[in-house]
Amino acid sequence: MKIKSYKQNFISQRKDKKSSDFYYIFAYSAHGYLYRIFEVFNKHKMPVDLISTSEVNVSLTFESKYNSEELINELKEIADVELYASRASISLIGKEINQEPNIAGRAFSVLGEKGINVEMISAGSSRINISFVVKQELADLCVRELHKVFFEDG
C-alpha cells in the first residue's frame, strides 16, 4: 500500500537524540506536573523535540549535544527518571497522513517483522506527521524498510 499523494510525503530521520521517561504515580492528579518538568528544561535552555504523555508517564526526546547530567538530577526531584542515549526519531510526514487508514499499523508491523522496537510514539493533531523513536543503530534500516513499504511496491 503506497501513501497517497507521493510527491507530498516524506520519511525523515534525526539521529543523536536522547530519550527520557518520567514516572510519577500521582501525576494525573498533580496540578502543574508538566509545567515543573518543562520549567527545568527551560532553565537549562534545552529544547524538547518529541513528547508523549499518559496519566503517570511523560516521555520526550532532546538532542544529545546538550549536557544532561545536571538537568536529569533536577528532574529526579520531580519524578523517577530513566535516560536512554543513542536514539533516533523517525517521522512519516505528509498532508493528513495520520488520517489515512492503517499507515501507522502498516509501519509498525513492518518494523516489528524486522525486529525493530518502537520505543515512543508521538502524533500531534496537525495531521502532518507521525513520529517515533528507535535505537540509533536501527534508524537507517528503519527508513529503508519504510521506504520499501510506502514508496516502492514492497
Regions found by a protein language model. Give the residues of each.
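A conserved regulatory-domain signal marking ACT and ACT-like small-molecule sensing domains
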Residues: 1-154
